[in-house]
From Swiss-Prot:
Keywords: Acyltransferase, Chromatin regulator, Cytoplasm, DNA damage, DNA repair, Nucleus, Transferase. It holds the Pfam family Hat1_N. Belongs to the HAT1 family. It comes from Aspergillus fumigatus (strain ATCC MYA-4609 / CBS 101355 / FGSC A1100 / Af293). Its EC number is 2.3.1.48. This is Histone acetyltransferase type B catalytic subunit. GO terms for biological process: DNA repair; subtelomeric heterochromatin formation.
Length: 570
């Protein structure tokens, strides 16, 4: 139905209209619902008057026509990697962003265009950018109503050299004589072959101007593909930049022309060194009143640190091909080889990255666990005290605590992450028939507990107790607020969710090993991670996520989440 609105007054009444505001950097919207199909109009065509919230429209518009001037930003933005060909640019790959809300607002809508295409071109080797905007028709300004200024909106997100004309950009890429000799900045740290294609991983300090220039060009990918991701500030003091290391993944391709580069970007990651205080307990502290000495200059790389992965991205055309595991393994190897690094951590990982990380760490630690015959002791008590009710979990009698601590510190894995991998391995050592996934009799286990006749049933019982113990310590502040019965129920539910997630990964690992045995292929532990465990936005492994988090929700939390959540974080 076409409505012509001319100097129309609407009274904000529950019977007449319901008004809801949504905020957006590109413009706010007022959503009207008054018995007719919902209409969406920009707030710039309405003005509010008085306490009665009367809306006064100053122009005539066909509302149905007006809605045709908005488009989905995710569909409008098109990212293209290009290489020089004989006469024109050759498209290597083209894809759309996963998110655009940091740039165009929470609604991810752009007003004022029909047939809009925002094409972001990047040279495949050095990411030289170019912004090109095309459309079929643009909204003509009516008073203060105008189409979104796209170049102005994108200016804070892309380098200045992206605002060149398409002919100038094509000429610059086609005539780039330096492309033939291009090498990624930094040093080569890892090479590998995947699906008969060659790849390299390069690492360099952010204090290097070439690394910084390449990262500046890639920064917009953070906002387009990493949920709640924040671009790095590359204008910090040099001593801060020295704490950052950037890893670039490149594919070695056949150059389309003699002057073209053989490198094509696949993804990148950034790591940051956090200072770690390690108290020297071998010496007794002594107070000295001597003047403060002016010692030699200390470089950040010489200080004890925790290495934290801040950003980790494989571009969509290369996801689900195993590049994420190779990149993570390269970072972990550098961490182990650096004597100043205490452990490797990850900044706010999503569940997709958790899958990749669990897969990589499991295959790194599994040979070490097997070597030392790590398993749960089914009889932690003496024979005469087995019938007594235990007052606490005998952790030291169940697993070799000192040995596991030494393994963790030697591989520099975060304590929480190490606990996940250990639980997964210990679960794999229990026969499937004695686990819940294999049809174990849980009722009998709850009755028999550690007094069960089968040692594997006792191992499974103690595995659940060890996992509950870790979950309770981690979520103690939440659990102590619950009644005892509800506390026990929440722990049981969470342990079952954790076990279910482990079973998914263990099944995937087992199937992969069977395929490799059938093909007669022997791979190194770091290379046996599933190719599907990339940190991308989609894939089989992300459809069956590892369930780790312990949450307690009430009705108010659910209502608030439904009202405020734009999208589910992954």
């Amino acid at each position: 139905m076409a409505l012509i609105l001319e100097r129309l007054y609407l009274l904000s009444s529950p019977r007449n209209a319901i008004i809801r505001n949504t905020r957006s950097e590109a413009g706010r919207e007022l959503i009207f619902s008054f018995g007719l199909p919902s209409l969406s109009l920009p707030s710039c065509i309405a003005s509010q008057y008085g306490k009665r919230r009367r809306l006064y429209f100053t122009t005539q518009l066909h509302v149905n026509s007006f809605l045709h001037w908005t488009c989905d930003a995710n569909d409008a933005v098109n990212i293209t990697l290009v290489q020089p060909d004989e006469q024109k640019l050759k498209t290597v790959s083209s894809f759309h962003p996963q998110f655009t809300y940091p740039i165009f607002g929470d609604d991810e809508r752009i007003f004022g265009y029909k047939g809009l295409i925002i094409r972001l071109r990047f040279a495949a080797h050095d990411l030289r950018p170019q912004l090109h905007i095309s459309y079929d028709e643009k909204f003509k300004p009516v008073e203060d109503i105008a189409a979104v200024d796209i170049p102005k909106t994108l200016k804070p997100w892309i380098p200045e050299d992206a605002f060149v004309t398409l002919p100038d950009y094509e000429k610059a890429v086609l005539e780039d004589k330096a492309a033939k000799d291009f090498k990624p900045p930094g040093k080569l740290v890892h090479c590998y072959v995947s699906r008969n294609r060659n790849f390299e991983i390069w690492a360099g300090s952010l204090a290097d101007p070439e690394v910084r220039r390449l990262l500046d060009r890639a920064q917009i990918f953070v906002s387009l593909f990493i949920e709640a991701g924040t671009p790095l500030a590359t204008d910090d003091p040099e001593w801060t930049l020295q704490r950052w290391t950037v890893y670039f993944v490149y594919e070695i391709v056949k150059p389309p022309t003699p002057t073209a580069s053989k490198y094509s970007i696949v993804g990148y990651a950034t790591t940051y060194r956090w200072w770690h205080y390690r108290r020297d307990r071998t010496q007794v502290p002594v107070v000295k009143n001597d003047p403060f000495p002016s010692g030699p200059e200390i470089h950040p790389s010489q200080l004890p640190s925790r290495l934290r992965i801040a950003q980790f991205l494989i571009l969509p055309p290369h996801q689900n091909s195993g590049h994420g595991r190779h990149l993570y393994t390269a970072i972990h190897s550098a961490c182990v080889q650096d004597p100043s690094v205490v452990e490797l951590t990850v900044e706010d990982p999503n569940e997709a990255f958790d899958v990749l990380r669990d897969s990589a760490d499991y295959h790194i630690l599994r040979p070490e666990f097997i070597k030392h015959e790590v398993n749960i002791n089914p009889d932690p008590y003496e024979a005469h005290s087995r019938n007594q009710r235990p007052r606490r979990v005998p952790t030291a009698a169940l697993i070799p605590v000192k040995l596991l601590h030494d393994i963790r510190t030697s591989y520099k894995i975060d304590s929480t992450q190490f606990a996940h991998i250990l639980e997964m391995f210990l679960l794999s050592q229990i026969p499937l028939k004695n686990r819940h996934a294999g049809g174990a009799n849980m009722s009998r286990l709850l009755i028999k507990k550690h007094r069960a006749e089968d040692p594997n049933e006792r191992r499974y019982y103690w595995w659940r107790m060890l996992t509950k113990q870790r979950l309770y310590k981690r979520s103690k502040d939440i659990l102590i607020q619950l009644d005892l019965d509800e506390r026990i129920q929440k722990l049981e539910e969470t342990v079952s969710n954790v076990e279910e997630g482990y079973e998914v990964l263990l099944k995937e690992f087992s199937e992969r090993e069977e395929k490799l045995k059938a093909r007669g292929v022997v791979e190194s532990p770091a290379a046996t991670v599933s190719d599907d465990a990339s940190a991308g936005p989609s894939g089989t492994s992300r459809d069956q996520r590892v369930k780790r988090k312990f949450t307690v929700e009430d009705d108010e939390d659910k209502v608030e989440e439904e009202d405020t959540a734009k999208r589910t974080k992954v």
